């Protein structure tokens, strides 16, 4: 009996403890559900008021052009009332004394998006100031241009200061040619009228030997004025009309020492192209022409094997008509001596 009583007592205590725990957990969840919306609302409200404060500060600095003078003063009063309410709820975002004393009449509203508080309020309009300043600058610039000394620019980087008329008239009184004229457009330090490969043109007669005219453009040494005196050196002076490879003109382009019209292999012209010492018309193998091509020392018409013509092709020293085995002709096929011995023997017996 006592054991059963103890078991029932333990079961009852466990059920009571579990019921109490569930009630406590339910109360905590309900309290959390009530406090979380309140905290979220305060956070959202603080964020919104922070944005309003920043927007007003930007408007006071004149960095937003969305607000204009056409707005009603009632809107400004509403904004100030919101700011005061936000200040009372959030003392950490409190304004300083100057901002607290600020009223709707003292609030500065920009009239232009480029308005700045640091600028002084002058009675002159900005457009008039800008026009007067531009006129002043243009006048000073025109005076500077009139007072500036005239100069001319040359392509080689030289500048000429002074009177332009004197430059256009010619050289200096002493005859020096340091100043170049404008109509002599040039490449580098040379005049365009004497475009050439070499040194630049000089006006003095002492430099005649170094002048190279365009009419005698050449590859080689330059042309001298005393060409007739040095005619013996004509191989060293080549004009454009005699462009060449070597020491002869282009009209006789050649391989060797003969003109192009006699192009050849060896010492004879192209018209007698040959293999050896005879012309091409007698192409041959050896010392005879092509018409007598042969194997040996006789012409092609008598092709042979040995020293006799092709018509007497033979094996040995006799003609083809007496083909034989050994030293006797085919008509007397035999195994023994030759026909000549038989003839000699018959003559001896007679």
UniProtKB/Swiss-Prot annotation:
It is found in: Secreted. Residues 23-53, 65-178, 201-210, 223-236, 339-350 form a propeptide. Residues 1-22 form the signal peptide. The modification Leucine amide is found at residues 61, 187, 197, 219, 245, 255, 265, 275, 285, 295, 305, 315, 325, 335. Residues 22-40, 120-136 have a biased composition (Polar residues). Keywords: Amidation, Cleavage on pair of basic residues, Neuropeptide, Repeat, Secreted, Signal. Expressed in all ganglia of the CNS, but only in a subset of neurons. InterPro entries: FMRFamide-related_np. GO terms for cellular component: extracellular region. One of its GO terms (biological process) is neuropeptide signaling pathway. Residues 22-49, 115-140 are annotated as: Disordered. Myomodulins enhance the relaxation rate of electrically-induced contraction of the penis retractor muscle. This is Myomodulin neuropeptides.
């Amino acid at each position: 009996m006592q054991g059963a009583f103890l078991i029932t007592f333990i079961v009852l205590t466990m059920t009571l403890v579990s019921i109490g725990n569930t009630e406590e957990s339910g109360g905590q969840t309900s309290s959390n559900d009530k406090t979380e919306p309140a905290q979220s609302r305060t956070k959202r409200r603080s964020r919104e008021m922070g944005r309003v404060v920043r927007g007003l500060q930007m408007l006071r600095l004149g960095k937003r052009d969305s607000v204009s003078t056409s707005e009603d003063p009632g809107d400004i009063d509403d904004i100030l009332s919101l700011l005061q309410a936000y200040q009372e709820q959030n003392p950490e975002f409190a304004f300083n004394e100057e901002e607290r004393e600020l009223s709707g009449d003292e609030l500065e509203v920009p009239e232009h998006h480029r308005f700045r508080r640091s600028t002084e309020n002058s009675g002159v309009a900005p457009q008039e100031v800008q026009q007067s300043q531009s006129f002043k600058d243009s006048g000073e610039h025109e005076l500077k241009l009139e007072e500036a000394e005239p100069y001319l620019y040359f392509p080689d980087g030289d500048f000429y200061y002074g009177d332009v008329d004197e430059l256009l008239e010619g050289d200096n009184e002493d005859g020096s040619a340091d100043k170049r004229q404008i109509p002599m457009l040039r490449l580098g330090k040379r005049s365009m009228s004497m475009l050439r490969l070499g040194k630049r043109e000089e006006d003095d007669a002492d430099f005649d030997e170094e002048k190279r005219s365009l009419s005698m453009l050449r590859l080689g040494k330059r042309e001298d004025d005393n060409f007739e005196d040095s005619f013996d050196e004509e191989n060293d002076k080549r004009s454009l009309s005699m462009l060449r490879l070597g020491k002869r003109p282009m009209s006789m382009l050649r391989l060797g020492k003969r003109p192009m019209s006699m192009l050849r292999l060896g010492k004879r012209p192209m018209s007698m192209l040959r293999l050896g010492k005879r012309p091409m018309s007698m192409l041959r193998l050896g010392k005879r022409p092509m018409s007598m091509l042969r194997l040996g020392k006789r012409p092609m018409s008598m092709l042979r094997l040995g020293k006799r013509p092709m018509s007497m092709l033979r094996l040995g020293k006799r003609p083809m008509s007496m083909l034989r085995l050994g030293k006797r002709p085919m008509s007397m096929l035999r195994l023994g001596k030759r026909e000549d011995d038989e003839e000699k023997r018959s003559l001896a017996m007679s």
